[in-house]
Regions:
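Generic detector of leucine side chains in alpha-helical contexts
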Residues: 10-12, 37, 70
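A generic structural signal for short
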Residues: 1, 36-37
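N-terminal acidic leader/helix
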Residues: 1-30, 65
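Detector for the mature cores of small, proteolytically processed
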Residues: 41-71
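Surface-exposed aromatic
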Residues: 30-36
Length: 71
């Protein structure tokens, strides 16, 4: 699991809000960082994966597709 800066978190959250009106929840704890979505959407997941790939991160979604970490 990769830890990213808060500025990068804000860029992702802003991009998702502007394109989809989707609120991406950011969770930062001692065990690391992870994100959760409110909407189950393949389009949003693809957008997030592509957006983060441009920043040299790989998105790893859990089985539900509603939570993800970065590598």
């Amino acid at each position: 699991m990769t830890i990213i800066s808060f500025d990068e978190v804000l860029k992702l959250k802003k991009a998702c809000d502007e394109k989809f009106k989707e609120h991406v929840h950011f969770h930062d704890a001692c065990g690391g960082q992870y994100f959760t979505l409110e909407t189950d959407s393949d389009e949003i997941r693809k957008f997030i994966a592509d957006f983060m790939q441009k920043m040299n991160y790989k998105v790893v979604f859990d089985k539900s597709g509603m939570s993800f970490t970065l590598e």
